[in-house]
């Protein structure tokens, strides 16, 4: 099972695309161990969608929607001025939700 990761980067944040892609890739590595349980299900669908938008005050708005074989994990935050903090918080939230199961 290979997780499907979808990045939706608003035109307002397009100039940060490389950084967003790198941060999401790094963060996926941190939740990889928690996603391994879905390897046992060959028909499992693991889809993680990350949406990033830059606000007019130079802060960022981000969403993480994960569908892990029917289990939903949702995270949304506004007003993060550091893009890395926003993405790391989103994946930390997902990791905590997975660890609790």
Which residue stretches match the model-derived regions?
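N-terminal, polar/charged subdomain of small-to-medium soluble alpha/beta proteins
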Residues: 1-101
């Amino acid at each position: 099972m290979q997780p499907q990761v979808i990045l939706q980067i608003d035109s307002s944040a397009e100039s940060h695309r490389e950084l967003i892609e790198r941060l999401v890739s790094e963060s996926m590595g941190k939740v990889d161990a928690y996603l391994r349980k879905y390897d046992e299900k060959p028909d499992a669908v693991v889809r993680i969608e990350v949406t990033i938008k830059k606000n007019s005050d130079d802060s960022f708005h981000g969403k993480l929607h994960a569908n892990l074989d029917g289990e939903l994990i949702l995270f949304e935050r506004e007003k993060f001025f550091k893009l890395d903090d926003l993405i790391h918080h989103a994946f930390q939230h997902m990791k905590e939700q997975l660890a609790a199961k």
